[in-house]
Amino acid sequence: MSLADLRKDYTLAGLAEKDLARDPFRQFEKWFQEAEAAKLAEPNAMTLATASPDGRPSARTVLLKGLDGRGFVFYSNYESRKGRELALNARVALVFPWIALERQVLIEGTVTTVAREESAAYFHSRPRASQLGAWVAQQSSVIPGRATLEEAMKALEKKHAGAEIPLPPNWGGYRVAPETIEFWQGRRSRLHDRLRYRRDKEGGWLVERLSP
C-alpha cells in the first residue's frame, strides 16, 4: 500500500494574532460553534492521551461534555485503563481534529475528578439505556463474548424496572485544567498557523506563534 501521494493543500482560512480572543476558552467556543455550524459529525469528539507512570502511552476518543473557565470535562469509568492511568499520572493531552475545517486544537494540562454531585447530575441527564450501560460495562476488562453484556443488561433492566438508576461508584467526570491550548489552522505549502496560549506565572495567558 502506497500512501506517499495522499496529500492536500490547505486553503480554507488563516489564523492571525489580531483575530484571536483574549481568552482561550472564548476562542475555543468560537471555533467549536463554527464546527457545529459546518455540521461536522460529533464536533465534541476528542482524542484523550494518557500515560502510565513508566511512560507507556495510550489514546482513545472520548466526548467533551462540559466547558467553563476551569477546564474541559468528560466522563468515564474510573476503573478503565484510562481511569487507572489518570489515578497515577494526571497529565494529559486532548486533540480536537476538525479536519473538514483544516483545523485542530491541542490542549495539554492536568486532570482532576469532578464533584460527585456534578457527575450525578450529568449521569441522570443521559438516556436510561446509557445509564444502565455504565453499570454493565466493566471497561477494559476481558469478557468471553458479547452475550455477557447483553445478559447483564437484561438483568439490570429487570432489577431497576420503574426505578431511578443510581450513579455507579466507579463512574464519573474528569476535568482537564489546561496549561497550554494550541489552535492550528492548515495553510498552503505546509506553512500552517499555530498559535498557542500558555499560562503565565500570574495565572493569565501568553500567546505565542509556533513554527509549523
Label each residue range with its predicted role.
Residues 1-212:
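Binding-site signature for planar aromatic cofactors or substrates
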